[in-house]
Amino acid sequence: MSGNSIGKLFSVTSFGESHGPAIGCIVDGCPPGLTLSVEDIQQELDRRKPGTSRHVTQRREADRVEILSGVFENTTTGTPIALLIRNEDQRSKDYSKIMDVFRPGHADYTYWQKYGIRDYRGGGRSSARETAVRVAAGAIARKWLQQRYGIVIRGYMAQLGSIAIPFKSWDVVNQNPFFVADNDYVQKLETFMDSLRKSGNSAGARINVVAEGVPVGWGEPVYDRLDADIAYAMMSINAVKGVEIGAGFNSITQKGTEHSDEITPEGFLSNNAGGILGGISSGQPVVVSVAIKPTSSIRLARRSIDKAGNPVLVETHGRHDPCVGIRATPIVEAMLAIVLMDHALRHRAQNADVVCSTPRIPGSTTNQIHPVEMQASAPRAEDPEPDESS
């Protein structure tokens, strides 16, 4: 199997399966001299780990990270950093009934057709268990970006099922199990999830993530655009089915006078572009949104086939997240950090000596992390009526 790595100068290669002895990754390209401890990584893993509330899988994994190489006396050496997380609470017997059938919505059928063999225990390599090591690698990137450039990466759940959650404050995001930015919605979400769990069904979610402090100039047109690499990274996360940058699909209904972010000496008036123009960071906050599908592992019977092609009904038992989006915020943050660090190093390698005579305008103003809200508040010229004769 190929395709287990991401990044060019800052690269992450993951390995391991859901019910194997361990999962891990090799982080290559981290510059030397970064102060890094187990605690720096563990605090991010603890935000993602399972069993933290009744609304997520009850698989009990401590997700204790081990640093095997690349760090000496709590300082990165510039050599590959090997990270390991041991699996401690597998229940492979829960999956014995599906070893010869294909679960609808899962990678069972496609893995079997491609490789002629599959690890059916917990999804094997296709399990979201693999995302733990992404969070571990992302913790390294986050710390380097923060120390080197002052970049802050934060995410929150913006929608759970049909419930849209408004943004109220970053301060409350880590104070509730849903990573929502409005604590007034927590009880409503609790009730929704309790009902969902009892029904045996699942739900999707929308996660927004913002990187503030990203300098102007990062991104490698044409095929390695910053937004293209971000979308690539986000789509590699299990269950992600859509990615938006800035205004995203709302751009369809906007007019040019509304979507194009006007520029003044004091800064941009809006951020519909999501902080990226022509594939290059503009100095504004980088704004990304991802859509996460409902969990495919549900207790309700679904039609499928077995290995012989015979029709069967599949009921998935075991410990599963009724909404994988609940634990997805740290994962989405991590993938954005990995992409940004890779592009930071690439920009530094090729363009560090570039001097531009045009002053860099301020990149961050009020509400630019919420482009839709900014559209309503930004001063704009009146849109002309369309010319019916044209």
Swiss-Prot record:
Pathway the protein contributes to: Metabolic intermediate biosynthesis; chorismate biosynthesis; chorismate from D-erythrose 4-phosphate and phosphoenolpyruvate: step 7/7
Residues covered by region (Disordered): 359-390
Record-level GO cellular component terms: cytosol
Keyword Lyase among record annotations: yes
Any one biological process term the GO annotation gives: amino acid biosynthetic process
Entry EC number(s): 4.2.3.5
Subunit comment: Homotetramer.
Role according to the record: This reaction introduces a second double bond into the aromatic ring system.
Descriptive protein name: Chorismate synthase
Lineage: Bacteria, Pseudomonadati, Pseudomonadota, Betaproteobacteria, Nitrosomonadales
